Amino acid sequence: MTKKEENTDLKKKVENGKIVSPVLPKGVKNYLIDIDGTIGDDIPNEEPDRMVTAKHYPDALKTINNWYDEGHIICFFTSRVESHRKVTQDWLNKHGFKFHSLLMGKPRGGNYHWIDNHLVKATKYNGKFTDLIEKEVKIEVFDDTDN
């Protein structure tokens, strides 16, 4: 069940007198969620016939749909290739996942490090999909001290 992102939700942002990329309203999150091995069985691109019958994870379905209903943006970001878009959309819809968009072609192999000018948070899926909790962890950042 896809729903177009409404541009009216985005808030204009100005820095140093110039308009920059807009931001979501306070409290609204952009969830970027993997598919294979995260919300359902881990199926490689080399075996697309298995994508149709892959099992979904009920806890992921419940949590993601709750986030959607709370007004957060749900985007599935997968390493599946563009030719697998239809089977992927059909599978998401068949299992009742609510989402706004689907991005194909995420690099394969893991060990991701996302660099962005907006706040980025990452959560590694370890077999249990629940609401998120706060936890202090060690992270890698750019050295922004003046030399």
Where are the language model's segments positioned?
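HAD-like aspartate-dependent phosphatase fold
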Residues: 1-147
